[in-house]
A protein has these predicted regions:
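Residue-level hotspots at or immediately adjacent to binding/recognition sites across diverse folds
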Residues: 2, 25-371
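Bacterial N-terminal signal peptides
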Residues: 12-23
Length: 371
């Protein structure tokens, strides 16, 4: 019951896209269903291309999308057609996918699962699950608590709770800098790192100043800094590859679903109810970007020409210049429930969402909506 309630509490904080992920978990019966889902390979599905897809990325020229029930979709024609991956060993919802080359990629999802592919997404292997992740976090917390520091002791109690709950906590974001160095973050402050391509993992939870275990939705590295975004307006930054983190003060108390660097020292953070905030000085000062609608922003993307795209859960696209000072709506909408975006090799925009994966032709990415 505790796992079920945890899933429902998580669901209450998420946007349309992530809400679907949490709801799928709660409906599965919580931790009681987790072992079966971790052991059950994803099934062939004739409607896979129209299923809930939660993330999409590039693997060289190939596109890879992941979503509900362990479904992984591949496209070799810039998103015009899709087919299922040959082998996915789990049936849990997969929440994000990233590749560092044409062949090497990782995906994360429910039940603390981390998957790895070495063949461009055709087949996948489990590198980590929730039970192993909880044990790693608890071991690190025990070592940190040996000093008797009150904060470390509190972290130990929280880590022991993760072990007792079982593998019911989802990873929600990941980033790999190369074939070796990667980071994953998730619900209740989950955060781990690897330096050997996922063969072994280390807890980051004692390094991130995140008391109370706020949900962490995104992690990315750009311009030498590692950025983590989460609920209650939290942003964390590491300039040393994750060895230490500092909290970036923000004026917003709601959820950030992502953040990305802008210019030499700028930041763009986006999240619930149309909140988009910009800083020119690495987070020392912030100004709100006016977007006209209070609709949750679910994805952001830097295009090949340097322009920035924001997308909200209604499917509206907004285009801004490289400085992110102003965004204008585009004429071409996407289906509601958009979860992620990527630019295909031919310049088209490809987006994952509640209705599968959509494609927008390159010419429409500059056409502004009529006022």
């Amino acid at each position: 019951m505790q796992a079920f309630l945890s899933g429902r509490r998580l669901a209450a904080t998420l946007s349309c896209a992530a809400l679907a992920v949490a709801t799928a978990f709660a409906a599965s019966g919580g931790s009681r269903a987790v072992p079966d889902l971790l052991a059950q390979p994803a099934q062939a599905n004739v409607r896979a291309a129209a299923s809930l897809q939660l993330s999409v990325t590039r693997a060289g020229k190939r596109l890879v999308s992941v979503g509900e029930r362990g479904l992984v979709l591949l496209s070799d024609d810039d998103g015009r057609s899709w087919r299922q991956a040959r082998e996915v060993p789990v049936s849990v919802a997969l929440t994000q996918v990233r590749f560092v080359s044409e062949t090497l990629g990782w995906a994360v999802g429910h039940s603390g699962v981390v998957l790895h592919s070495a063949d461009g997404g055709e087949t996948w292997q489990v590198q980590l699950d929730g039970m192993k992740a909880a044990a790693l976090i608890a071991d690190a917390a025990k070592a940190g608590a040996a000093s008797g520091d009150p904060a470390a002791l509190k972290h130990l109690r929280e880590a022991e709770g993760l072990v007792q709950d079982g593998p019911d906590k989802p990873f929600l974001g990941l980033h790999f800098a190369d074939a070796k160095r990667g980071w994953v973050v998730g619900a209740y402050g989950l955060a781990l790192a690897t330096t050997d391509g996922g063969k072994t993992w280390q807890s980051l939870m004692g390094r991130i100043p995140n008391p109370g275990g706020k949900h962490l939705y995104a992690v990315r590295q750009d311009a030498g800094s590692l950025l983590v975004a989460g609920e209650q307006g939290v942003l964390f930054r590491s300039g040393d590859g994750g060895a230490s983190f500092e909290k970036i003060p923000t004026p917003y108390a709601g959820t950030f679903f992502g953040a990305l660097p802008v210019g030499a020292h700028g930041l763009l953070a986006y999240g619930l109810r149309g909140n988009a905030w910009r800083s020119d000085d690495a987070g020392a000062h912030w100004s709100r970007i006016e977007l006209a609608r209070a609709v949750t922003l679910t994805a952001a993307l830097r295009l090949a020409d340097g322009a920035l795209l924001l997308a909200d859960e209604s499917g509206r696209l907004l285009r801004g210049d490289a400085t992110a000072t102003r965004f204008v709506p585009l004429a071409a909408p996407l289906p509601a429930g958009l979860t992620a975006m990527v630019q295909a090799a031919d310049g088209a925009l490809v987006a994952s969402g509640a209705r599968g994966v959509s494609r927008i032709e390159p010419a429409t990415l500059t056409a502004e909506a009529q006022k």
